Amino acid sequence: MIPSDPPNKRPVKFRHGMLAFVLLALVMFCCVVVLGTGPQIPIVIGCTLAGAIALYLRFTWEEVLQSMLKGILDALEAVLILMCIGMMIGTWILSGTVPTLIYYGLYVISPELFLPVAFLGTLLVGIVLGSWGAAGTIGIAFIGIAAALNIPLGMAAGAIIAGAYVSEIASPLTDGPVLCAAIAKVNVFDLCKKFLPLVLIVCAISIALYYALGIMQGANFSNTDSSNIDELLTALSSSYHIGPATLIPLAIMIVCIIVQVPAIPAFLLGVALGVIEAVVLQGADISIALEAANTGVISTTGCEVLDTLFSTGGIEEMLPTICIVILVMAYVGILQHTGLMASLISPITSRLRRLGSLSAATVGTGALFNVLMPDQYPAIALSCKMYGEAFARRNVSGSIWSNIVNSSAGITSVLIPWNTCSIYMVTILGVSCLEYLPYAFFCYLYPAIVVLVAITLGEKLWWKRRV
């Protein structure tokens, strides 16, 4: 039985914080990579081991429990937002919003323009469905089209994945920005807008590179067969009312972002508009539209690609992600409120005097966490908690430093062959990580340019100097 009033606590040393981190990384790697399990149970084991270290340091069980609860409390807004996102995905598929985006994207495709169109197409769908949703839906369609157009699948997968992962930086509907915003205690819309000019610059560079690749490879795109595209277009137009009216929910969401409507009310408005359009434009029964918000959509278009594409959404679809977020934040809570995290990060941040070096260390740490702990959620949460206070002491706003964290921890995960993000992409697209990695331009250009801007212009642009 754990004593309720232990003697004076032992001093928390660097080795204690490092041990808690190394144990989680080791358990995550063994379970996820070697045994092929999901990340939830390894994180539970990591929480148990971190709690055991805290008990060894003579914290009481009540203190450990309160540490976990405080960590989870930081994530409650993110949990609510993730539920809203699930509801909105389901209703926007049923309303025809997502099908219309895909229809217009496929309509303008050509062999030479395939790579930039694949990048932009998955980017647009990713804004709504998230990176995994976009790659696992329209990404599958683009891979099939690439095969028909005789386009190297490594190039195609790189463009698809890069486009999908733009959403992990720029979309308020995706997990990474939501988690970062919750930990930094900032509005998720403000977070996504803050670095939008930088995102657009890197997207423009990526599109130019894909266009150049398409032109150079154009002569090799032989045996072109447009039947796959025609089949998808026919199935979309016969199953949904396609037209500008179905994009009204998306347009209103963009307005909400511009005028900084709080995240949860904006998402609920998006859900309501999706339900209304599903009933009015698509002729869905109101009960089916509401159930799409709960359990998602089960597509029956008769087209296998589209049925895979649209059988998603709803609160239930988000439950595994919500579980991971809660468990990760419980682990982070133990590290933060028992001093284990401070013991680990203080020796590092104390040596980083300038904003550029601190930003570079943050980006490097996020990438390292994705290597050592093969899942992006621990990488994001730990990076935010480790470096947030160091940025705050330099008077850098939460919407800026959380973007710096997410620029690495949120998107480099897909470049690591044993990370869950890469494993997922390899599984659904059928292309190895080493094949697509050279062509996922955004995923490594963006963090590099963030560091470059931080070193050269960061103190002028991002540092609010105290008067």
Region roles according to the model:
Residues 136-142, 160-161, 266-276, 404-405:
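Central hydrophobic cores of alpha-helical transmembrane segments
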Residues 22-26, 30, 48, 52, ...:
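Generic alpha-helical transmembrane segments of integral inner-membrane proteins
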Residues 32-37, 55-59, 98, 130-134, ...:
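Transmembrane helix-loop junctions in multipass membrane proteins, especially transporters and channels
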Residues 2-87, 94-112, 235-239, 251-327, ...:
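Hydrophobic transmembrane alpha-helices of multi-pass solute/ion transporters
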Residues 59-147, 302-388:
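Membrane-embedded alpha-helical segments and adjacent helix-loop junctions characteristic
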Residues 53-62, 146-153, 170-174, 277-289, ...:
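Juxtamembrane membrane-interface segments at transmembrane alpha-helix termini
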Residues 6-15, 145-241, 396-467:
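Membrane-core helix-loop-helix motifs of multi-pass transport proteins
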Residues 18-19, 44, 79-80, 112-117, ...:
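Hydrophobic alpha-helical transmembrane segments
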